Curated annotation (Swiss-Prot):
Zn(2+) 1 binds at H58, H60, D150, D303. Substrate binds at H60, L61, R62, N92, N276, H307, F321, G322. This is Dihydroorotase. CDD domains: DHOase_IIa. Pathway: Pyrimidine metabolism; UMP biosynthesis via de novo pathway; (S)-dihydroorotate from bicarbonate: step 3/3. The active site is at D303. Belongs to the metallo-dependent hydrolases superfamily. DHOase family. Class I DHOase subfamily. GO terms for cellular component: cytoplasm. InterPro entries: Amidohydro-rel, DHOase, DHOase/Allantoinase_Hydrolase, Dihydroorotase_CS, Metal-dep_hydrolase_composite, Metal_Hydrolase.
Length: 426
């Protein structure tokens, strides 16, 4: 049992209120002006913000098969440090969770080593990226969170349509990395100013937006919840906005780096700035910000993609796609958007908690009496530089090295257990 004393919580209107929070038996037992108990442990939250634990539906944990990049243990330590209490792990592992047996083995490893809640995706196709569909019913029974081939787009419309029909019958979501391989043209960055300057092959916007346009129509026909991963282009935002207006059940996420950076920020041919989707144009970034504010884009997800140093500390042509994000998302977003008064604090917290929970019908993301005690304590005055040497993640691949941010998680409770406190994993 813990009593969080003298903290602040956000009320429904976004105002800060001084409250104590009692955690008992993994639940939020009481929220009150003052709580006095004779047993349990007191946690001093004076001057700190107490919020629901963050939810990230887009995380690459790499295990099994990629343990040199990340493991379930190191990835969930990184999540705890970043304030995340629920993360959803992508299926681009070796082996791929395309069968009940593999899914059950991943679930067993999660139970054995994870520091926070991990909800694993199953793949849509066998081996990920084929045209043979998995056994949706068996994988749901084995505990799959949803279905995705993240890392590659499902190329054939017929394959995607059949997948959507099967997912809809089970009331489960299809989560899509949207990329038409015939429109990539071997690109490694956005097809724009930076590509031209560096003489690199570019990935055009239409590689993403064309597949989203196809898929929203398939989702409408199938009656499926269709979720767009890491949306990155103005055309994609327009397609999703139009689909929502038409009543199609589509949701979308955006990554912190696509909100903060665009192609003009890239300093040179450095593999740590290579990600998929790539950093797009200023106009694309503006459309993402507008789409998030008007509800076209539903929430924020990191696309945490750790790699070994030798896979990133090379020119872009040779580097792996992806950057890490679990340990830096909140401080970066708070610094860039809340401290600059572009967003309210409540907007940011909602986009990292209740919004993803609502989209995927998860019973988390709220701080109220009776809720699961997934809680992060935030010090909104704490200032620190982003230093990959301090990361719990095995991946150190971030373009934000050395950036000074204000507002950091200082403690994380997962189902009432203190898993992170002042720089230390418990």
């Amino acid at each position: 049992m813990y009593v969080l004393k003298n903290g602040q919580v956000l009320n429904a209107s976004g105002k800060l209120e001084s409250k104590d929070v009692l955690i008992q038996n993994g639940k939020v037992n009481l929220i009150a002006d003052s709580i006095e108990v004779t047993s349990g442990e007191e946690f001093d939250a004076t001057g700190k913000l107490i919020t629901p634990g963050f939810i990230d539906v887009h995380v690459h944990l790499r295990e099994p098969g990629g343990e040199h990049k990340e493991t379930i243990l190191t990835g969930t330590k990184a999540a705890a440090r970043g304030g995340y209490t629920t993360i959803c792990s992508m299926p681009n592992t070796k082996p791929v969770p395309d069968s009940k047996e593999v899914m059950e083995s991943i679930q067993a490893k999660i139970k054995e080593t994870a520091k926070v809640r991990v909800l694993p995706y199953a793949s849509i196709t066998t081996s990920l990226g084929t045209d043979e569909l998995v056994d949706f019913e068996a994988l749901k029974e084995a505990g799959a969170f949803a279905f995705t081939d993240d890392g590659v787009g499902v190329q054939l419309a017929g394959t995607m349509y059949e997948a959507m029909k099967r997912a809809a019958a089970l009331d489960m979501a299809i989560v899509a990395h949207c990329e038409d391989n015939s429109l990539i043209y071997g690109g490694v960055v956005h097809d724009g100013i930076f590509a031209e300057k560096e003489g690199l092959k570019g990935i055009p916007n239409i590689a993403e937006s064309v597949q989203i346009a196809r898929d929203v129509l398939l989702a409408e026909a199938a009656g499926c919840h269709y979720h767009v991963c890491h949306i990155s282009t103005k055309e994609s935002v327009r397609v999703v906005r139009d689909a929502k207006r038409a009543g199609i059940r589509v949701t979308a996420e955006v990554s912190p780096h696509h909100l903060i950076l665009d192609e003009e920020a890239i300093p040179g041919n450095d593999g740590n700035w290579k990600m998929n989707p790539p950093l797009r144009s200023k106009e694309d970034r503006a459309a993402l910000l507008e789409g998030l504010l008007d509800g076209t884009i539903d929430f924020i997800a990191t696309d945490h993609a750790p790699h070994a140093a030798e896979e990133k500390n090379v020119p872009m042509e040779q580097a792996a796609f992806g950057i890490v994000g679990l340990e830096t998302a909140f401080p970066l977003l708070y610094t860039h958007f809340v401290k600059t008064n572009e967003w309210t604090l409540k907007q940011l917290i909602d986009w990292m908690t209740v919004k993803p929970a609502e989209c995927f019908k998860l019973p988390y993301g709220k701080l109220e009496e009776g809720s699961v005690a997934d809680i992060v304590v935030l010090d909104l005055e704490k200032e620190a530089n982003i230093d990959p040497d301090t990361f719990y993640s095995k991946g150190k691949n971030t373009p934000f090295v050395g950036e000074t941010c204000i507002g950091w998680p200082v403690a994380t409770f997962a189902e009432g257990t203190l898993v992170y406190n002042e720089g230390e994993i418990k």
